[in-house]
Amino acid sequence: MLKLLLDEHISAGVANGVHRRNRSLVVHSMVQWESGNFLGKEDSVCLLEAAKQRLTLVTYDRRTIPPLLKVWAEEERSHGGVIFVDEKTISPADIGGLVRALISLVDEAGGMDWTNQVYFLRSGH
């Protein structure tokens, strides 16, 4: 089952919007998750705790996360999955667009095991 953790650069409004459209879906904003204790922490620390909680990270960060995932794959370390969003496809300011794309993805693939999955989100999913 897909459970989402939105990175700290994604508006908490996205988590609220996704939750309004699908109340059964677990979705956390990094700001609210674990009382904000992971804000500003290293990516590896956040990914490790997210994996423990079976959360899939949603992020625009295509600079630091991909190299980390490569290292983890080489070390045979598991993560809870990562969904990348491209700002040219869905602007960070387009809260409604990101909500719609995530809901579409959940409707289509929310039941699969997201462990170690990497997905590139498209507009409208």
Segments from the language model and where they lie:
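TIR-domain catalytic/interaction hotspot
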Residues: 35-51
